[in-house]
Amino acid sequence: MSGCRVGTGFDAHRLVPGRKLMLAGVEVAHPRGLEGHSDGDCAIHALCDALLGAAGEGDMGRHFPSADPRWKDASGASFLERAARLVDARGFSVENVDVTVIAQEPALAPYIDKMRAALGRCLALETERVSVKAKSTDGLGATGRGEGIAAIATVLLSKRE
């Protein structure tokens, strides 16, 4: 059996007034933020699910249930750091991560380098092993209408000897 595992995660949240917009651990200037029990950072939530899934640890709902008041307004970074510790405890190392944020607005290109650095810090990874991309749906669907933001993440783990 190979010592490598791949995980995929997805998350989406509605944009609402009165909240900060957090994406990949970075505050993004926008009049609306993502709705959620925590900070709503769908990029980090997708990445956490990818990490946990690859390590055979389930998903965020198992480890950080929204019904648990401990996670009310928790930062995505705190979830990611905890997920990384679980992956490490299972004997895996993170080789690389790849996150795609799907949003019609705001333009995310000015934030990509900060997002890569923030995720790298949480995971103790060099920035060149962290990819963050931004895509739009060119007006199609809920993200295209500006109703929300979604993210997809993929990770590669290797088993330590």
Where are these regions (language model features)?
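Mobile acidic interaction elements
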Residues: G139-G141
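RNase III-family endoribonuclease catalytic core
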Residues: S2-K114, A118, L123
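Short acidic capping loops at alpha-helix termini that bridge into adjacent secondary structure
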Residues: E126-R129
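C-terminal edge-of-domain segments
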Residues: R145-E161
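Pyridoxal 5′-phosphate
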Residues: V132-S136
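Short Gly/Pro-enriched turn/cap motifs at secondary-structure boundaries
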Residues: L34, T143-G144
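SAM-dependent methyltransferases
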Residues: M1-G3, R160-E161
